[in-house]
Amino acid sequence: MIPFKDITLADRDTITAFTMKSDRRNCDLSFSNLCSWRFLYDTQFAVIDDFLVFKFWAGEQLAYMMPVGNGDLKAVLRKLIEDADKEKHNFCMLGVCSNMRADLEAILPERFIFTEARAYADYIYLRSDLATLKGKKFQAKRNHINRFRNTYPDYEYTPITPDRIQECLDLEAEWCKVNNCDQQEGTGNERRALIYALHNFEALGLTGGILHVNGKIVAFTFGMPINHETFGVHVEKADTSIDGAYAMINYEFANRIPEQYIYINREEDLGIEGLRKAKLSYQPVTILEKYMACLKDHPMDMVRW
């Protein structure tokens, strides 16, 4: 029996000891995301045979993540399959990236059916691209930045500190009011995860920034490292009446992310056309494909998560 347990804030060191050394760049492995969304997925974890493993619920479907670690991956997968059998559920893993798919096909050939989940693909950027916006491909972005600076020459960027959490919460509440959050599917869950993250900002290991215009908050963003070379930006909110606020908070935060992080993961577009267009406009170097991987013995329709 795998000794799964609920994820808590106290598990940060245990989990990041695996994820920070890993080559996995998917946002699902961010400790902040794992904790902030646990209310929805009942996420649990365990450490077995030098691997970090996760199980969670996507609606009524039990699901797992690809194990993180080094060693006998095949043996660990067999234990996860046995765990699913004991739970009387089909064995499926969500968030399986292309390199993980290759590993599965190598060690358990012809055992899995892979279903691509484009809406959940992560957008990966070079930190240096977002921090400098150099080159012709970023001309429009530089124009946004320059226009913002000319319009609001006295703007201020400050880091998120405990005494500034409330103004972030206030902007989020106003953003939701303007964007009719209560009428859009999924925004209630997003709000709950965001509020949890802000209330547990330091315990989660988050860093972030706030943009002020005329002394008033107009944007904020935050995130944390996913692994040793990839930083995840998890949340970005701005006052849409302030032209260029989104572009400016993106630019300023990218300039504060330590240079050791080569990549920035700005997460998925959830199949939302406007969000996809915005993420593509920043010229990702990789769109990190994700798949649902289920045993061929138990084919499944695509699971939303």
Placement of each model-derived feature along the sequence:
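Amide-forming acyltransferase catalytic core, primarily the GNAT-like/NAT-type
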Residues: 1-49
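Conserved donor-binding loop and adjoining core beta-sheet/short helix segment
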Residues: 28-99, 212-240
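Short, glycine/charge-rich beta-strand/loop segments that flank catalytic centers
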Residues: 90-107, 119-121
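Short catalytic-loop micro-motif centered on adjacent basic/acidic residues
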Residues: 92-93, 158, 263-266
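Conserved active-site alpha-helix within GNAT-family acetyltransferase domains
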Residues: 100-114, 143, 270-287
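Acyltransferase donor/substrate-recognition loop-hinge adjacent to the catalytic core
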Residues: 110-184
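Short, conserved active-site entrance elements at the starts or edges of catalytic domains
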Residues: 163-216
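Aromatic (often tryptophan-rich) hydrophobic motifs at membrane interfaces
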Residues: 206-296
